[in-house]
Every structure is written in structure tokens, then in C-alpha cells.
């Protein structure tokens, strides 16, 4: 078999009381499916997933519903050998929030190469939006890791990207906030860091 079919879903309910507004109930759920190539030896690889995400705030200051149709895709092509490849990843969101509908598109073209003791990724993050201020943003997507010994590595990264501010993300920040509509997404132009990691086992290290 060269293709793997994936399907799944989630359902979540959060009930709590907030003084002056009484009982709140936040309901979230999603249904998703996708296809993925499952032969690493093939030159062309792909991973395509589509999800329908539902969210509702009931008994809140102003009950709201949010529906998102999200499509993620990642296509890669191996170059001269398995150690290097080029690819492009994307996420397209079609958002439906009460009477306001808009779409966002995030593209991530990249080049990746690895050797016995180092890995390199050179890419860019391109963010577009329609019916949402018609925004265009660009940021780097760079990562370099160099293994100096068996249990230590030097790393350098510079990245960025869209910061989503839908109802789901806002609930994670503060479920008690008085939110009447999702905020516009932000965009991180640059987040750069350089450091040194060391540790005896995977998952336990200092940096």
C-alpha cells in the first residue's frame, strides 16, 4: 500500500460559572480526514488533511458560534539523495463567525538537508488573508542544528508566522474573558534564538 487514509474527530465541553453572567458552556468539536503517502523511499511525498472545526459559546455575555473549514497539505520532493529535499506546506482556513466570513492562507516553502551530525532547514512563511483587511506578511523559517557530541548540540533558529485569535485560542488564554467576537490574528515577524543544548537522555536536557 502506498497511501494511508486517516479519519478522526474530537468533542469537548467546558461548563463553569462566572459571577454576574451566571453559567457558561463552551462546546468544541471537529471531524477530520486525510491521505498520506507511506513509502519513504518514494521521491514524491504528500500529506493532505481536511478538518471541520465547530465551536460554540452558550450562556455567555453574547452567545457566539465559530465554524472553520481547515485544509493542511505538505508536499516534498527528494533531490539527489534522501539527505536533502524541497517542499511546501500550506494551511487554508475558511472561517465563518456569525455574519463575518473570511479566509486565511499560510504557505511555507522550504529546503531541508541533513548529514551525520547536522541538520539545516531554509524556508519562508507567507501569510495572506481575504475579506480580513487583505493582509500580506512574510517571515523566515530557518533552523540549523549541529551535534557537537553524543549528548549536546548547538542550534540556531529564526522563524515567525500567524498568531491565531479564534475562540479556541482565546479560551486557552482566558476562559473568563468577556469576548463578543474573535480578535484579528496577529503575525510574528521574527522570533530568533541561538543556544546550546546538552543532556544525558532524550527529553532531559539543559539549554
What are these regions (language model features)?
Residues 3-9, 44-50, 69, 83-88, ...:
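Transmembrane beta-strands of outer-membrane beta-barrel proteins
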Residues 19-25, 36-38, 57-63, 75, ...:
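Outer-membrane beta-barrel proteins
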Residues 100, 114, 119-207:
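Exposed, low-structure sequence patches enriched in small/polar residues
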Residues 1-45, 51-68, 97:
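Flexible loop and strand-edge segments within Gram-negative outer membrane beta-barrel domains
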Residues 1, 31-39, 71-79, 107-113, ...:
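Residues on the lipid-exposed face of transmembrane beta-strands in outer-membrane beta-barrel proteins
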Amino acid at each position: 500500500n502506498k497511501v494511508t487514509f486517516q479519519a478522526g474527530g474530537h468533542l469537548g465541553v467546558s461548563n463553569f460559572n462566572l459571577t454576574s453572567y451566571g453559567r457558561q458552556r463552551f462546546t468544541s468539536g471537529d471531524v477530520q480526514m486525510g491521505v498520506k503517502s507511506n513509502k519513504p523511499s518514494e521521491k514524491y511525498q504528500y500529506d493532505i488533511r481536511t478538518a471541520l472545526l465547530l465551536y460554540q459559546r452558550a450562556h455567555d455575555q453574547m452567545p457566539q458560534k465559530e465554524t472553520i473549514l481547515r485544509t493542511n497539505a505538505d508536499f516534498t520532493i527528494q533531490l539527489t539523495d534522501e539527505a536533502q529535499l524541497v517542499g511546501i506546506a500550506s494551511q487554508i482556513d475558511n472561517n465563518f463567525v456569525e455574519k463575518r466570513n473570511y479566509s486565511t492562507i499560510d504557505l511555507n516553502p522550504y529546503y531541508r538537508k541533513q548529514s551525520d551530525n547536522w541538520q539545516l532547514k531554509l524556508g519562508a512563511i507567507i501569510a495572506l488573508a481575504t475579506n480580513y483587511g487583505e493582509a500580506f506578511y512574510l517571515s523566515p523559517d530557518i533552523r540549523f542544528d549541529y551535534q557537537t557530541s553524543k549528548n549536546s548540540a548547538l542550534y540556531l533558529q529564526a522563524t515567525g508566522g500567524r498568531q491565531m485569535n479564534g475562540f479556541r485560542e482565546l479560551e486557552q488564554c482566558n476562559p473568563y474573558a468577556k469576548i463578543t467576537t474573535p480578535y484579528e490574528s496577529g503575525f510574528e515577524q521574527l522570533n530568533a534564538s541561538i543556544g546550546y543544548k546538552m543532556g544525558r537522555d532524550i527529553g532531559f536536557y539543559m539549554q
